[in-house]
């Protein structure tokens, strides 16, 4: 036990362990989940944490690979305004109609489609070119349980929001709508029919903040211990026979405390 403590203190293994944990935490693919209903707008991210002058890039893919410098094209880039100029927002490529809007550190999807649920990645780049670690967001859709028709029962309309077929679009009809008038094939599992907001995103953000606070507390404790030389004093107390510290003459010494 004493040899293990001596090895840890002499080689600063605890400090390297803390640094390694911080690096793994930053590179981990922990995405903030946001659920939304099809057809509604949604905003990813928040305005907090944006520093003036930062250029913010948004990608509709996972952050893995983007942090490694792979050649990827953003779907939206917020270019901060220069003195005397208006704000600029660029989308790549420019869609028609406009699908995304980005401002500061947020991305707004103006109309959520069934193809939108996926991972989105945000990367902030200050003017000096040293971009921050990317942040991952997951957009998902949720749905309610649909009801089915049983023999002898009246037809129950599905509560699943669907898209009419081409022959029923732009037509007004007074007859009762039947589920046969809708095309429900090809819709992905998990089609949305309710909106829960950004509760999951806030929970993930709170968990990330808690982890960082814990790491900072551990670092502060380690600094205090080494400032008051507590590990060295404990090592001297346990090393009653002078195995760990010996002077040039081979006898136990306490010069390391001076």
Curated annotation (Swiss-Prot):
Transmembrane residue ranges: 208-228
Origin superkingdom: Viruses
Location in the cell: Membrane
Membrane topology annotation: Single-pass membrane protein
GO cellular component: membrane
Region of interest: Disordered: 147-183
Compositional bias segments (type: Polar residues): 157-166
Compositionally biased region (Basic residues): 167-177
Keywords: Glycoprotein, Membrane, Transmembrane, Transmembrane helix
Bias type Low complexity, positions: 147-156
Family, similarity comment: Belongs to the RL11 family.
Protein name: Uncharacterized protein UL10
UniProt organism field: Human cytomegalovirus (strain AD169) (HHV-5)
Gene name of the record: UL10
């Amino acid at each position: 036990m004493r040899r293990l403590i001596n090895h840890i203190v002499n080689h600063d293994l605890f400090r390297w362990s803390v640094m390694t944990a911080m690096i793994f935490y930053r590179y981990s693919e922990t995405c903030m989940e946001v659920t939304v209903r099809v057809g509604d707008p949604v905003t990813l991210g928040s305005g907090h944490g944006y520093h003036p002058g930062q250029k913010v890039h948004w990608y509709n893919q996972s952050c893995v690979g983007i942090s490694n410098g792979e050649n990827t094209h953003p779907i939206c880039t917020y270019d901060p305004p220069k003195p005397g100029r208006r704000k600029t927002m660029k989308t790549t490529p420019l869609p028609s109609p406009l699908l995304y809007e980005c401002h500061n550190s947020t991305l707004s999807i103006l109309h959520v489609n069934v193809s939108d649920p996926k991972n989105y990645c945000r990367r902030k780049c200050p003017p000096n070119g040293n971009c921050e670690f990317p942040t991952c967001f997951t957009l998902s859709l949720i749905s309610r349980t649909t009801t089915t028709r049983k023999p002898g029962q009246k037809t129950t309309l599905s509560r699943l929001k669907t898209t009419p077929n081409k022959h029923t679009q732009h037509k007004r009809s007074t007859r009762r709508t039947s589920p046969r008038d809708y095309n429900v094939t090809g819709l992905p599992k998990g089609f949305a029919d309710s909106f829960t907001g950004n509760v999951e995103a806030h929970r993930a953000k709170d968990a990330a903040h808690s982890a960082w606070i814990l790491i900072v507390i551990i670092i502060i404790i380690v600094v205090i211990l080494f400032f008051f030389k507590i590990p060295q004093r404990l090592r001297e107390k346990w090393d009653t026979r002078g195995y760990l510290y010996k002077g040039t003459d081979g006898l136990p010494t306490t010069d390391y405390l001076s």
